[in-house]
Amino acid sequence: PFQPEKVSFQAGRIMLNRIKKLISERSTFAFETTLTTKSYVNIIKVAKAKKYKIILFYFWLNSVELALARIEDRVKKGGHNIPNNVVIRRYTRSLENLVNIFIPICNEWSIFDNSTDKMNLIAEGTRLSNSLILDNQQWEQIYAYKS
C-alpha cells in the first residue's frame, strides 16, 4: 500500500475493465485520469457509439515545477510520491494528448486553471469548432502542445 507505483499498471487495468462493464450496463459514470495514456481513446469511441455524451474537465497547472511542488507538499502530509522524471514526462504528455487526441473526440470540454487557490475557467467548447476562450494567454500556453 505504500508503493503505489508498483501496482499502477494493475490498477489501470482494473479501472479500464470497470469502465467497460459500466458502459455495457449503460450506467452513468465519471473517472479521473492524467490523460497520459491513449488507453481511453477506444473506450470513449465505444461509449460514443452507444450514445454516451463524453464531457471532459481538465484541471491544468501552469508549470511542471508547480506540479512537483504540490507532490512534495502532499508527501510531507503523508501522501504518496511520484518520481520527478515521471511527473515531468506526464506533464508534457498530458497536454499533448489533451489538445491532439481528447478534445477532438469529446462532445464537450472545459479547461480550468488550477494553479492558484481560486480555480478559473480558461476555455470550453464542443470539439474545436465551437469554443469559448476566456483566457487567451493561458489557452495559447496549452494549445502550444498541438502537433
Language-model segment annotations:
Residues N100-S147:
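NTP-dependent small-molecule kinase module
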Residues S8-G12, T37, Y91:
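A conditional alpha-helix N-cap/helix-loop micro-motif detector
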Residues F31-Y40, L61:
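Acidic, metal-coordinating catalytic cores used for nucleic-acid/nucleotide bond scission
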Residues N42-V46:
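A short acidic, amphipathic alpha-helical/loop segment
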Residues R26, K50-I55, I105-E108:
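Short glycine-/polar-rich loops that comprise or flank the Walker A/P-loop
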